[in-house]
């Protein structure tokens, strides 16, 4: 085959849309239990950050993305911003965070979901997606019933605002865990132990950003 001398688009790739219509908020649980390994391998926090790094890279030029790690307890919650919506998309901030962020204390997911939803609701993009990467029942509450009720209320409020809420779950897929997550999130759950998880992500992303 031959390339004309005056060809100007030999190595040109198709440019992303000039206007991004989607905003993503990745909310990562960095509570103490996330420091435990999965099947003797890397910690759940490391795996969650690796998942977020894949999403961060895939969404470059397609969506505005904010990434936050959270922990806390009954009376205090800390949010660590890994990447803000309008920061330059250079390198991988999630990969950098792997050596800078450690598992902390408890997690009060309902509070953090509300804070993320308020932030995301201010965006002007047509689609607004909140992904919660966590490993189980929030520990920053006085009881399991209180934890489940608070998360469910926060998720329902976010959905009423027009946000799509998707939990990515880093825990064993037991009947008990599935039931607890279903009571909190009701739908759209992705378990990180799924063999076809990457395929699920790919299909999900293509569906969400179209």
Q: Residues of each region from the PLM?
A:
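Acidic, glycine-rich A-domain
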Residues: 1-210
């Amino acid at each position: 085959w031959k390339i004309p001398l005056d060809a100007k688009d030999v190595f040109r790739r198709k440019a992303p849309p000039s206007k991004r219509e989607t905003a993503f908020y990745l909310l990562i649980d960095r509570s103490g239990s996330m420091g435990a390994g999965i099947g003797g391998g890397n910690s759940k926090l490391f795996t969650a950050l690796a998942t977020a790094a894949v999403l961060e890279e895939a969404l470059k030029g397609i969506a505005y993305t904010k990434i936050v790690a959270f922990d806390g307890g009954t009376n205090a919650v800390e949010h660590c911003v890994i990447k803000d919506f309008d920061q330059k998309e250079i390198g991988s901030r999630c990969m950098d965070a792997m050596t800078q962020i450690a598992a902390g204390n408890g997690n009060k997911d309902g509070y953090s979901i509300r804070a993320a939803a308020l932030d995301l609701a201010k965006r002007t993009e047509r689609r607004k997606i909140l992904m919660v990467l966590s490993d189980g029942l929030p520990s920053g509450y006085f009881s399991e019933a209180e934890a489940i009720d608070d998360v469910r209320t926060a998720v329902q409020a976010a959905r009423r605002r027009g946000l799509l809420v998707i939990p990515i779950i880093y825990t064993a897929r037991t009947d008990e865990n599935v039931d607890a997550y279903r009571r909190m999130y009701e739908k759209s759950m992705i378990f990180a132990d799924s063999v076809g998880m990457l395929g699920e992500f790919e299909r999900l992303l293509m569906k969400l950003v179209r």
